[in-house]
């Protein structure tokens, strides 16, 4: 548990660091207005206003974008965003790793699963529970203008996993949380196998006879030897043995 806590703290620090860099890029994007490179590059761009990971202009743009360099030197499709791509990929990996660790840790054992739906709005995400399986799907439509015409592209994901045998379909809930992550939860803690009720205590059985068998009756005591007529003996069974009285 100590190693798991250290790993989670390290992951959280890395996520906070990358989030700070992303907030700085958002501030730069708010300063600049609509990107003018969509005239030439928009067939390859998935967004209209350049939010951080969805702009793909840098993947197809030429060595120097004349419109951006002339009017918007702070455009997000410049060399800075190109260099930030590894950080963005690293952030997504960290988020996926964190979700898996949290889903498998003991403190969140009521979480049946989590699906990363980054890039989709909450109303675009659908969760369906049927036949002991959970299906999470999301779909969106991208529309952009290219040389006076409109073009459309579609993006969708679909994830499916099975429910544990002890979870009822009616008890499954889901929530759209931070980090664009859909969490599938159950009110009770899932277990790997159905819990067995405690066995009632069996009534006490009568004491069994000794293994050596019932005790045999005591053999009859041997009769006392005939007493000396001159010396009467003590009655049989006394603590003193028969003896002669010497006068």
UniProtKB/Swiss-Prot annotation:
It is found in: Cell projection, Cilium, Flagellum; Cytoplasm, Cytoskeleton; Cytoplasm, Cytoskeleton, Microtubule organizing center, Centrosome. Signal peptide: none annotated. Disruption phenotype: Absent sperm head. Does not affect localization of Ccdc42 to the centrosome or sperm flagellum. Its main location: other. InterPro entries: A-crystallin/Hsp20_dom (IPR002068), HSP20-like_chaperone (IPR008978), ODF1_ACD (IPR037552), ODFP (IPR037389). Pfam families: HSP20 (PF00011). Residues 34-78 are annotated as: 2 X 5 AA repeats of [RC]-C-L-C-D. Keywords: Cell projection, Cilium, Cytoplasm, Cytoskeleton, Developmental protein, Differentiation, Flagellum, Phosphoprotein, Repeat, Spermatogenesis. The keyword Cytoplasm applies. Gene3D superfamilies: 2.60.40.790. GO terms for biological process: cell differentiation; spermatogenesis. One of its GO terms (cellular component) is cytoplasm. The modification Phosphoserine is found at residues 5, 10, 64, 87, 108-109, 137, 153, 175, 180. Sequence repeats lie at residues 34-38, 74-78. The keyword Calcium does not apply. Residues 195-235 are annotated as: C-X-P repeat region. The C-terminal contains many C-X-P repeats. Interacts (via leucine zipper motif) with TCP11. Interacts with SPAG4. Interacts with KLC3. Interacts with CCDC42. Component of the outer dense fibers (ODF) of spermatozoa. ODF are filamentous structures located on the outside of the axoneme in the midpiece and principal piece of the mammalian sperm tail and may help to maintain the passive elastic structures and elastic recoil of the sperm tail. This is Outer dense fiber protein 1.
